[in-house]
From Swiss-Prot:
It holds the Pfam family Porphobil_deamC. The gene is hemC. The lineage of its organism: Archaea, Thermoproteota, Thermoprotei, Desulfurococcales, Pyrodictiaceae. It catalyses: 4 porphobilinogen + H2O = hydroxymethylbilane + 4 NH4(+). One of its GO terms (molecular function) is hydroxymethylbilane synthase activity. Pathway: Porphyrin-containing compound metabolism; protoporphyrin-IX biosynthesis; coproporphyrinogen-III from 5-aminolevulinate: step 2/4. Belongs to the HMBS family. This is Probable porphobilinogen deaminase. Tetrapolymerization of the monopyrrole PBG into the hydroxymethylbilane pre-uroporphyrinogen in several discrete steps. The keyword Nuclease does not apply. GO terms for cellular component: cytoplasm.
């Protein structure tokens, strides 16, 4: 069996793709593959915020186009970069085991400091509206500055003194094997983006030749969490401008779901917690989204 695999060409994207392929090879040892590298607008315009060049879905659409046009059999994504409405004809077919979904704080000098240890006026680098608003909710005295580029570039900018601290996804550091000191930000303070830590493999819904193999290779815990979070995202709405976090966790026979929404300036925040049947992840996600929309309307926070 040979698969043509669409992916971006960054170190992190390639690392994620190899994780997915290794999971497939465990159930299909004869697997051969060819990488179809796609250069997206997000890769070209790294000096601009996501919101200025397309926002959520910036990386997803052009990679998926390779599958839709028949140039690739599957596309591999970091699921948090995939909007709730994907290209028609594609399905989420496989997820390897989930990496840590959390965000982390990296402080210049390699010291493991918490958000509470940063001095007033400290400059924190991130381009995420979710991270800015949620952290402003607990530390309104911090200054947030746009940060783009790959992980190496972001860490270099930190050490050059452009920032006092930066916020990164823990999963990215793990996948790249980056060994640095950091503080894992508790999800009660900063709930992850929906899909964070999950690698998603997409293919055409008509590919009956490879769908059974991908399903067999998929981690069922990660898939249940992914389906709950994506159902939540689809109903809750919001895009890259929306300070929205959500995280499902399957523990034992229960699927737990935590979500929060903040106003852009961080002055207001609402959150919900629900739990339900792990065999009905979509229902759990929709229940959380319905409750969050109700609370947001009551508090006057826009989605």
């Amino acid at each position: 069996m040979k698969l043509r695999v669409a992916t971006r060409g960054s170190k992190l994207s390639i690392a994620q793709t190899m994780i997915a392929l290794e999971a497939i090879k465990r159930v299909e040892p004869s697997l051969e593959y060819e990488l179809v590298i796609v250069k997206t607008r997000g890769d070209i315009h790294q000096d601009k915020p996501f919101t200025a060049i397309g926002g959520k879905g910036l990386f997803e659409k052009e990679v998926n186009l390779a599958v839709l046009e028949g140039r690739a059999d599957i596309a591999v994504h970091s699921l948090k970069d995939v909007p709730s409405a994907i290209s028609p004809g594609l399905v989420l077919a496989m997820t390897p085991p989930r990496d840590p979904p959390y965000d982390v704080l990296v402080v210049r000098g390699g010291k493991e400091k918490t958000i509470w240890d940063l001095p007033s006026g400290a400059i924190v680098g991130t381009s995420s509206a979710r991270r800015v608003a949620m952290l402003k909710h607990v530390r309104r005295d911090l200054v947030f500055k746009v940060l783009r580029g790959n992980v190496d570039t972001r860490l270099r900018k930190l050490e050059q003194g452009q920032y006092d601290a930066i916020v990164l996804a823990e999963a990215g550091l793990k996948r790249l094997g980056v060994d640095i000191e950091y503080w894992r930000i508790p999800p009660d303070i900063l709930p992850p983006a929906p899909g964070q830590g999950i690698i998603g493999v997409y293919t055409l819904s008509s590919r009956s030749d490879i769908l059974p193999i991908l399903e067999k290779a998929s981690d069922q815990k990660a898939m249940a969490e992914a389906r709950a979070e994506r159902a939540f995202l689809a109903y809750a709405g919001g895009g890259c401008h929306t300070p929205l976090g959500a995280y499902a966790e399957l523990r034992g026979n229960t699927l737990y779901f935590h979500a929060a929404l903040a106003s852009p300036d961080g002055s207001r925040r609402v959150e919900v917690r629900v739990e339900g049947d792990p065999d009905k992840p979509t229902q759990v996600g929709l229940e959380a989204a319905f409750e969050l929309r109700r609370l947001a309307a009551r508090e006057g926070i826009s989605l």
